[in-house]
């Protein structure tokens, strides 16, 4: 999971609100498409939760504070608040035979979360194991990752994909430090590359590599 700095809402949403838009269900398809495009650019075309690649065809708009109309806490104004919106994947719905196969918002439902992609402090509490497992020493965030969002789901390739990204970074470090201890500047360059979008896109599952490089840099 990566920190997402929310940007200005798309002009299409601003105009609809000016024209009296009161709830997400009344929003036009054109405005929803504009929101999807803006969210994708904002998040580097990665799911806000699992960090797999998403695009216009396989993403959905997630309300961080759930806005299901059956929920007594639903708030029409929050349903059209751009700051409450995230782009997420399909939640493994095509490969699911039971609920335990679902991930991200499809597994979450309307359960409140502690971890928040919009809050850098909470994202910094996420850790990873060498096998790609996501966890946190904060019990509430750990529950979000492992249970509510099911981000270590064994019927997906999430853990394997994270491990693959981490292995590439480790191999790069080994190659650069074959003769000497890798320079801090080299680690900073590797980190900067992962944190920079290429053609509006981040590397899928890059969170584990960013976490690893930051940990290495903290020792200098």
Predicted regions and their residues:
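Short, charged surface segments at domain edges that flank catalytic/cofactor-binding sites
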Residues: 2-46, 70-72, 76-80
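Short cysteine-rich loop/turn motifs with clustered Cys
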Residues: 34-59, 91
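Histidine-centered active-site/metal-ligand motif
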Residues: 63, 104, 162
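Long, low-complexity, intrinsically disordered segments enriched in glycines and aromatic residues
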Residues: 97-158
């Amino acid at each position: 999971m990566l920190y997402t700095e929310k940007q200005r809402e798309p002009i299409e949403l601003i105009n609809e609100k000016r024209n009296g838009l009161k709830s997400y269900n009344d929003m036009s398809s054109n405005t929803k498409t504009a929101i999807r495009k803006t969210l994708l650019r904002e998040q580097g075309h990665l799911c806000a939760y699992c960090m797999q690649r998403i695009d216009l065809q396989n993403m959905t708009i997630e309300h961080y504070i759930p806005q299901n109309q059956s929920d007594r806490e639903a708030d029409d104004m929050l349903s059209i608040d751009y700051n409450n919106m995230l782009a997420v994947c399909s939640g493994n719905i095509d490969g699911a035979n039971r609920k335990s196969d679902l991930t991200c918002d499809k597994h979450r439902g309307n359960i409140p979360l502690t971890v928040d992609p919009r809050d850098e402090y909470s994202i910094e509490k996420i850790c990873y194991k060498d096998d790609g497992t996501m966890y946190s020493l904060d019990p509430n965030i750990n529950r979000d990752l492992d249970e509510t969002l099911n981000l270590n789901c064994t019927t997906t390739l999430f853990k394997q994909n994270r491990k693959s990204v981490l292995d590439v970074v480790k191999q790069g470090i080994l190659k650069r430090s074959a003769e000497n201890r890798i320079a801090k500047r080299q680690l900073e360059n590797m980190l900067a590359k992962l944190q920079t979008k290429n053609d509006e896109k981040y590397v899928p599952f890059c969170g584990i590599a960013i976490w690893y490089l930051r940990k290495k840099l903290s020792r200098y």
